[in-house]
Amino acid sequence: MLLWALLPMHAQKEALVASNDSVDTLLEKLLPEANDHLNAHMNLEFYTSAAGYFTEGTLDEAAFKINRVRLEILGSFSKDFSWHFRQSFNKYSNPHALDNLSSSIEYAYVNWKPSDKFNLTIGKQFVAMGGYEYYLNSNKVREFSDFNEYVAAYQAGLSAAFNFSPTQELVLQVTNFRSGEDEDMYVYGRPAEIAKAKVPVITTLNWNGLFADKALQFRYAASWGQQAEGRNILYLTAANVYEKGPVIAYLDVMYSRQGLDTHCIISDMQGPIVENPVTAQHTEYLSFIADFDYRFHPHWNAYIKGAYETAGVYKTNGLFEKGLYRKTWNLQACVEFFPMKGSELMIFGHLLHKGHQLTGRARALGAVAPDTQRISIGLVYTIPVF
């Protein structure tokens, strides 16, 4: 898993593989006398698996899957300016109305670093919320919590990072709240009686700190944005991490209060008995995510992971009464094998159990949520193209 050893600590800004090797890049070969700061690197990320999917212990399907293929190109063109582009081949849309980019483009930004104390990033980037699971390159996560699964993590905007010391960083970020129209974000669209937001942006204040010789790591953030006229969203997110030697352990606490149901979990509870389903309003979500990783051999790593999550409504609206609607938990166990020392090649075996408990409010809407399981083996490899 990724090491939070150095700041700045922008979420998922690390390259898929390290770029400080001794092999000349294509630019260095073509332009041997060029500026020392002119460079570029390309990485290809590949993740495939074979998995069996179960509902209440009964096999539904077993199949092979290409979970993720991503290509990134990153580099710099002067001492102070760098850039990063990344595209996923597992998701696609026509250019969205708001940011004019396909959802397949995850990164498209330029970074200006005039000093060691300050840097500025503009373009499509990662929303700088807290949480270790959220922060990790998704290549490192076999199963996300529901909370992180439904966050629109890549948005166009601007962020400024202030590094007060090698172990303390403060990030102020303003990005779009959404990429496209409201109809693209909410499962049943924006309620007709609520006007569209004129400034659909979200502002994030993020603090990253390292203590105890970097063994204790914290990543806290607060985000607030406007979803529509009179409807706002709040995120409070925190990562508490211990990383030393072969051990990585963390506890994430993630909370969101949403004027409109951005996560769509409660909105999706409306079953066939609801003739005219609508997007829920005034929803809130809370998640606790815990993980313990142990690298018991240079070629072997194992971890156990669990999450406990709740979904509720904090103010009655329409069909949705105030109160708790669902409790969810997932339990995971994974063994990872790294056959080549110093390589990003990894083979894994993973077990997942996900359980749900619906309250009477959810069942009154016709909601159904059986327990599910998954058994998977897979391969992950990040290839440094140049």
Describe each PLM feature range.
Residues K29-G52, T58-G180, N208-A212, K354:
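Outer membrane beta-barrel
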Residues D24, N67-L71, S103-V110, Y154-L158, ...:
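Hydrophobic, lipid-facing positions within transmembrane beta-strands of outer-membrane proteins
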Residues E133-Y135, D184-M185, H263:
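Short aromatic-enriched loop/helix-cap "lid" or pocket-rim segments at secondary-structure transitions
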Residues M1-A5:
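Bacterial N-terminal signal peptides
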Residues L7-Y47, G378:
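N-terminal periplasmic/intermembrane-space "pro-region" immediately following the signal or transit peptide
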Residues E14-A18, S49-L59, A97-L98, A212-F386:
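Outer-membrane beta-barrel pore domains
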Residues Q173, F177-L234:
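Loop-centered beta-sheet repeat module
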Residues N100-S103, S179-Y186, F320-T328:
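Short, electropositive alpha-helical surface patch
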